[in-house]
């Protein structure tokens, strides 16, 4: 149990049996009336963002979320199998929990899995990953100066936009949050 005065960004709260991450908060002390805390909360499972105001000093439940480094092993039907790198326990995580991270997951890649009471909540990948281009159209000779882009398929099957000079077989850096091309990988 904590009070609204103890809130910090990134904290996970248990409100009415649902888990919410504190995205931002602001303690407000108006000239007239009691102080209050204005927060922006993000639902852990759905990603829905809401604004919620608490009176200052109100008790809130803080959920314990355990973030563990795990290794992605393989995909089995509708779930992804991860192994805890410390205990070697295997977790079958549903595809909807993995979400967009599935587009950038390679076998044996490490990711951070957030667990609440043994239940996986979400999967966090590093900000950027290096992946190989498996297919892209060759760049047209006259198009190089325009700075245009073309679609490319990654080894995970995901499609991204890359500059015209990138060819099949090259390793590129991709932002896992936006799916954007960041540059060639340093090999």
Curated annotation (Swiss-Prot):
Pathway noted in the entry: Protein biosynthesis; polypeptide chain elongation
NCBIfam families given in the database record: efp, PRK00529.1
Cysteines joined through disulfide linkages: none
GO cellular-component term (any): cytoplasm
Record Pfam families: EFP, EFP_N, Elong-fact-P_C
Major subcellular site: cytoplasm
This protein's name: Elongation factor P
UniProt entry keywords in alphabetical sequence: Cytoplasm, Elongation factor, Protein biosynthesis
Gene3D superfamilies: 2.30.30.30, Nucleic acid-binding proteins
GO molecular function, one term: translation elongation factor activity
Function according to Swiss-Prot or TrEMBL: Involved in peptide bond synthesis. Stimulates efficient translation and peptide-bond synthesis on native or reconstituted 70S ribosomes in vitro. Probably functions indirectly by altering the affinity of the ribosome for aminoacyl-tRNA, thus increasing their reactivity as acceptors for peptidyl transferase.
GO biological process: peptide biosynthetic process
Subcellular location: Cytoplasm
Family in the record: Belongs to the elongation factor P family.
Superkingdom, taxonomy of origin: Bacteria
């Amino acid at each position: 149990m904590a009070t609204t005065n103890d809130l910090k960004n990134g904290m996970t709260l248990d409100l009415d049996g649902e888990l919410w991450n504190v995205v931002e908060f602001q303690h407000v002390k108006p000239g007239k009336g009691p102080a209050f805390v204005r927060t922006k909360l993000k639902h852990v499972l759905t990603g829905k963002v809401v604004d919620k105001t608490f009176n200052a000093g109100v008790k809130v439940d803080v959920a314990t979320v355990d973030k563990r480094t795990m290794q992605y092993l393989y995909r089995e039907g509708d779930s992804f199998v991860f192994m805890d790198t410390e205990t070697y326990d295997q977790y079958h995580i549903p595809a909807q929990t993995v979400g967009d991270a599935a587009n950038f997951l390679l076998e044996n890649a490490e990711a951070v899995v957030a667990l609440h009471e043994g239940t996986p909540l979400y999967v966090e990948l590093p900000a950027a990953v290096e992946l190989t281009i498996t297919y892209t159209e060759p760049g047209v000779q006259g198009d190089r100066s325009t700075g245009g882009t073309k679609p490319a398929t990654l080894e995970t099957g995901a499609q991204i936009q890359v500059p015209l000079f990138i060819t099949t077989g090259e390793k590129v850096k991709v932002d896992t949050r936006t799916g954007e091309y960041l540059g060639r990988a340093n090999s």
